Amino acid sequence: MRKITVIFVCLTFLLSCVADRDFDSNLSSKNQEDGWVEYNQNDFPQALVAFERAVSLNPNLSDAHNGLGWAHLSMSQVPNTNTQIIAKAQRSFQDAILADTQNSDAWIGLANVLFLRRQKPSDFEAAIQAIENALAADRDYFFRHDYDSIADIHILKSFCYYHLGKKTQADSIIRTVLKSDPTNQSATQLKKLLAF
């Protein structure tokens, strides 16, 4: 009888753990969704809270890490922010990529961070590589946050080449962008800059 009681208690415990994991999974997904809602409403501090909750419940949620990165990156564009926020964004994008190497949005976020950081030329080289990785990754992730077209991504790549002093590569990319989208204002402005 004692053996049956022990088995019953163990089974009850195991089943409750499965239910807890399902609950945590649902709650982490809900927090991730809430984070993107807050992000899209430009409430970056609340987005951070929601994404942090999601990650604490499920550290493997690539898009929650990605959301943390984009929220930090968006906050870094506010005056009087410091390099620590950029570093947090970078770490979040790297965590997103570790969880899912096909997360092209996280690769683009990482490229943005490296471009903004500008500590050394290798930042621009790494940003270009991140863009290449994004272009080779899952296209379903594209255009969800802060980018409207593939042209925008190529323009970022062109800016990186420009800052590396590789104006020929930068100009080549801009010409390609303008062939497909002759009215693209960013590409037109960069072309003028490259003419100097």
Language-model-detected regions and their locations in the chain:
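Flexible helix-coil transition and linker loops at the boundaries of alpha-helical arrays
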Residues: D20-D24, S56-S62, D95-D105, L135-I150
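Alpha-helical segment of the N-proximal tetratricopeptide repeat
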Residues: N26-L57, Q77
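Short coil/turn linking the two alpha-helices of tandem helical-hairpin repeats
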Residues: G69, S74-T81, A111, L116-P121, ...
